[in-house]
From Swiss-Prot:
GO biological process, one term: regulation of cell shape
Primary gene name: gpsB
Coiled coil location: 32-69
Function: Divisome component that associates with the complex late in its assembly, after the Z-ring is formed, and is dependent on DivIC and PBP2B for its recruitment to the divisome. Together with EzrA, is a key component of the system that regulates PBP1 localization during cell cycle progression. Its main role could be the removal of PBP1 from the cell pole after pole maturation is completed. Also contributes to the recruitment of PBP1 to the division complex. Not essential for septum formation.
Name the record gives this protein: Cell cycle protein GpsB
Top-level taxonomy: Bacteria, Bacillati, Bacillota, Bacilli, Lactobacillales
Source organism (scientific name): Streptococcus pyogenes serotype M49 (strain NZ131)
Keywords for the protein's UniProt record, in alphabetical order: Cell cycle, Cell division, Cell shape, Coiled coil, Cytoplasm
Amino acid sequence: MTSIIYSPKDIFEQEFKTSMRGFDKKEVDEFLDNVIKDYENFNAQIEALKAENEALKKAKYQARNTVSATVQQPVPQPTRVAQSATNFDILKRISKLEKEVFGKQIIE
């Protein structure tokens, strides 16, 4: 993008040379031409940002719809056999640990 020539402070502090009948017309015209260029650049930047903003909103909407569709799909449930086998293994281990702990207490 093109660069901005004047900041708001530059415009506010601009002083023109005076000639016999007031300000130098050529200098004022050049300054105003540059201000017009700045406004055109600002408008171009605003339009580009609006387009980018709209594209991002569409992408966000599409991503949200994709996530919603994914979340709505049923999650496969784990098989009951694997869960019962896990429970059985846990019970065996607890039983073994109890025998070790209580067996040592009986000996003492």
